[in-house]
Every structure is written in C-alpha cells, then in structure tokens.
C-alpha cells in the first residue's frame, strides 16, 4: 500500500525585502516518512519549516499539509504539527513534570508526565529541573514536548547540533521509534550523514 502525501510544497518563495531566503523550493513528504531538508546555514531550511508551521508568511508558492491549504486552513494545520522548541524555550528552573503539565495545559491535552518521559527514556528524570539535564537529554525532552498534542507530523530543526556522537545515535533511535509509531518526522540538518 502506498503512503499518501502529507505535505506538498510547490515553488515556495520567501523574500525579506530584496533578499530571497527561500528560492522556489518544491518537495513532497509522505505519511510515516522521515524527511530531511539538507543545506548549509542560511539556506532557508528553518524558514521553510516556519512557513509550513504557519509561523511565517510566504511570499509565493503553495503549501498543503494533510490536504489543508496553508492559505485557508492555518488553524487546522497548527493542530496536527508538533514543533520542537530549542533549549532556550524552556523555563530552566522547572521540573520536567511541571514543564509537561504546562505544555499540556497550553494544548488543552491531558498527559501523564511519566508516560511521556518514558517514550524518550527520561522517566527517571521526572523530578529533575530542565537545567540539570545533559545536552542529549534536553534534546530528547524537547522532542517529548512535540508529542503532547499527538501530532501527525513533528518538525525538528537541527536536532543534533552540539551533541556528542553517542547522544546523536540515541536521538536518531528515538526519531526512528517515533516514526514507527506513525508520526511523520521532518528534520533540518547541515550534516550529510544525517540526511542519508
């Protein structure tokens, strides 16, 4: 059985004045896929994701997410995408369980912190504060928060930047596990080996 398209981008353009940050990119992502946007810093990868996430306006082109038109259905699109926050997006002094409860309230989605942390192998850190985590643990926790609203798609922007080789492998095992549970994963990276 062929997977269906969950994201379709056609000739996407984003201009900032005379600077063209995204230059007519087109691609398709299929349900259950891990899809990577590869390119150097400044190539427009993050901007492309931010447009699809409805965080930025596009200058041209078409975007469809799960059949919804970005120009007409932004609220519906927002509900099916989980977005990874960078470490600076978390209150460092709160316990992981408190942060999950905070995000759970924002999404109006009841979640058991222990169950969610178990998915990312952090169940023993429930009472730890965010600032007490290692770099790899912080990345895994940020991925856990993308799963709170049970999204069809998650976006991970440069998820392994700054991680040591073992933490990178652990993160990739987690991403593959998330995909195996039916969630489509979109990543940006400037590492060729990750894109492969």
Regions found by a protein language model. Name each.
Residues 150:
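Conserved catalytic motifs of ABC-family nucleotide-binding domains
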Residues 101, 105, 110-126:
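Conserved ABC ATPase "signature" region
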Residues 129-133:
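Conserved ABC ATPase signature
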Residues 61-69, 76-77:
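Conserved ABC transporter NBD signature motif
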């Amino acid at each position: 059985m062929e997977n269906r398209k969950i994201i379709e981008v056609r000739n996407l353009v984003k201009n900032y004045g005379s600077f063209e940050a995204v230059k007519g990119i087109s691609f398709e992502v299929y349900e259950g896929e891990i899809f990577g946007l590869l390119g150097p810093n400044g190539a427009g990868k993050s901007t492309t994701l931010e447009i699809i996430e409805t965080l930025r306006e596009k200058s041209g082109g078409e975007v469809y997410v799960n059949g919804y038109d970005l120009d007409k259905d932004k609220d519906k699109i927002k509900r099916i995408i989980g977005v990874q926050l960078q470490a600076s997006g978390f209150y460092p002094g709160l316990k992981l369980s408190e942060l999950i409860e905070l995000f759970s309230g924002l999404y109006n989605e009841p979640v058991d912190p222990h169950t969610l942390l178990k998915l990312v192998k952090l169940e023993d850190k429930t009472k730890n504060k965010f600032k007490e985590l290692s770099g790899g643990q912080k990345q895994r926790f940020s991925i856990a928060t993308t799963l709170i609203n049970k999204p069809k798609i998650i976006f991970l922007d440069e998820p392994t930047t700054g991680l040591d080789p073992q933490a990178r492998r652990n993160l990739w095992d987690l991403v593959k596990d998330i995909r195996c549970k039916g969630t489509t994963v979109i990543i940006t990276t400037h590492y060729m080996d990750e894109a492969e």
